[in-house]
Amino acid sequence: MARVLIVPCGERGRALARELRAAGHAVRGTTRGAHVAEIAQTGAEPYVGDPDRIATLMDALHGVTIVCWLTGTIPDADLHAGRLRMLWEKLVDTPVRGVVYEGMIPEGEAIARASSQTWQIPLEVLDGDPRRETWTADAVAAVDRLLGA
């Protein structure tokens, strides 16, 4: 069993949380505040934090093995650049052993890959259309691969 942090835990994140909980993992899902009840209904622990303010996520990393950074469809360039880079820099001093990055933005994927190499934290990139039927299964498989690394 591992603890997985899902940032943010929107609709796709909650589907992933349900599957990870069913597999026996502890899951913590972040929200800016609007989806606390929906996250709790998945069996995940809700955590109020903002990916635009990395400092608000630091306490959520306690005991976390895998971070799922699911910002691929959010049209905020900073989440795929400065904030993403800052997250990786902060992960060095945590128990995190892997990151799943939703790689819809080429610049963000490049930062994630470079950061993975620099900080020696394994990375799995989810690419392709997140609306496809296999997205959740692909995300679960990415988490499983990181846990096996």
Stretch-by-stretch model annotation:
Residues 3, 65-66, 98:
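Structural motif
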Residues 4-9:
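Conserved N-terminal Rossmann-fold NAD(P)-binding element of oxidoreductases
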Residues 13-14:
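N-terminal Rossmann-fold NAD(P) dinucleotide-binding loop
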Residues 20:
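Aromatic pocket-lining residues of Rossmann-like dinucleotide-binding sites
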Residues 23-27:
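A generic structural motif
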Residues 29, 34-85:
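NAD(P)H-binding glycine-rich loop region in Rossmannoid oxidoreductase-like domains
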Residues 85-128:
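Conserved Rossmann-fold NAD(P)-dependent oxidoreductase catalytic core, especially the SDR/UDP-sugar
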Residues 129-149:
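Glycine-rich phosphate/pyrophosphate-binding loop and the adjoining helix
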